[in-house]
């Protein structure tokens, strides 16, 4: 786990400098957090009067436990994680009923099933060990669906909990697992080194609401201004990132936060994450159709089995709408 601190100070206004509002954010490491890197480096958080402490999580269980314990205020996490824990289908339980919700989007799809070089077909994965973050959350259920529709029902392969994408990619490249689901752009380096893409969520299952902004409802109700400031900063950073005039500087920022990344890989990461059909969502707008895909998969594979309500049960875009009204 790596933690870094951004000290952001608001501009001089009147006879005194206002104190920044403190915010604790937990994210997954890697290029999927590029807008966060930009918001830090280019001062978008500072302009909103925020002092943001950012923690990179080793996995989804640590992240959700932390936000429920009050160690973190906001999480950038898959929409399905929020559904799982709200429905009692997650990897852990809490002393109080969870009040997690999603307040904005972040990333659509960009999920790949990456396999060892010697794996040519889905049938080759039978009886093999596959790496997952957690057994019942995140992208594991997507992998169940992908494998089953290609002839491999649950039970025809083994699963190993490994935590976030970075840990799983490491296990894959070390030969400890045969396959894993990877969030872009972290599939690029393995593919360059001969690992194969066996499946792609967007082409095989349709749009999928992946990374989303989430918090506890109780925290959001008592900190609406901080939440709206975060949303404005994130959206502004995303707009700056997508502007082609900022391509070179954006690449420099990427390399600063993810050291030793070759320029060619950063260019491929930009291509993957700024695709017209998937990647960073314009203005971080939540995608109901992508959420429906996630809910359909969870309804099929979630344990205990249950009917799930409409996506609106887990989402409140009020803070998002108010934030961008003032932008």
Cite the ranges covered by each PLM segment.
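Positively charged n-region of N-terminal signal peptides that target proteins for export
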Residues: 1-4
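Sec/Tat signal peptide C-region and signal peptidase I cleavage site
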Residues: 14-18
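Short, glycine-/small- and polar/acidic-enriched structural segments
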Residues: 19-153, 159-163, 168-171, 178-184, ...
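Short, solvent-exposed loop/beta-turn-alpha elements that line the ligand-binding surface or hinge
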Residues: 47, 94, 203-206, 277-286
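Pocket-lining segment of extracytoplasmic ligand-binding domains
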Residues: 80-81, 89-90, 166-259
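Secondary-structure end/capping motifs
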Residues: 221-305
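Conserved C-terminal helix/tail region of periplasmic/extracytoplasmic solute-binding proteins
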Residues: 292-327
């Amino acid at each position: 786990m790596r933690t870094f601190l951004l000290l952001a100070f608001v501009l001089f206004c009147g006879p005194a400098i206002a104190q920044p509002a403190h915010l604790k954010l937990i994210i997954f490491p890697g290029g999927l957090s590029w807008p966060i890197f930009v918001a830090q480096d280019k001062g978008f958080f500072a302009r909103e009067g925020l002092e943001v402490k950012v923690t990179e999580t080793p996995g989804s269980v640590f992240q959700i436990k932390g936000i429920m314990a009050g160690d973190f205020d906001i999480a950038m996490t898959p929409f399905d994680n929020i559904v799982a824990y709200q429905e009692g289908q997650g990897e852990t339980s809490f002393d109080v009923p969870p009040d997690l919700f999603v307040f904005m989007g972040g990333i659509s799809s960009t999920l790949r099933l990456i396999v060892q070089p010697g794996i040519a077909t889905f049938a080759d994965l039978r009886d093999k060990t596959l790496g997952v973050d957690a057994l019942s959350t995140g992208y594991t259920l997507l992998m169940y669906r992908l494998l089953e529709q290609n002839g491999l029902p649950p039970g025809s392969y083994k699963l190993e909990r490994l935590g976030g994408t970075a840990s799983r990619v490491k296990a894959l490249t070390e030969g400890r697992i045969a396959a894993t689901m990877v969030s872009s752009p972290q599939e690029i380096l393995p593919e360059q080194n001969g690992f194969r893409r066996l499946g792609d969520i967007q082409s095989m299952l349709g749009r999928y609401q992946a990374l989303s902004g989430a918090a506890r409802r109780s925290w959001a109700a008592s900190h609406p201004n901080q939440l709206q400031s975060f949303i404005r900063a994130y959206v502004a950073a995303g707009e700056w990132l997508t502007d082609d005039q900022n391509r070179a500087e954006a690449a420099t920022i990427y390399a600063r936060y993810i050291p030793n990344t070759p320029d060619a890989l950063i260019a491929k990461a930009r291509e993957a994450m700024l695709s017209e059909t998937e990647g960073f969502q314009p203005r971080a707008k939540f995608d109901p159709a992508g959420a429906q895909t996630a809910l359909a998969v969870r309804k099929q594979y979630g344990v205990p089995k249950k009917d799930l309500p409409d996506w609106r049960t887990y989402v409140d875009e009020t803070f998002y709408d108010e934030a961008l009204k003032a932008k």
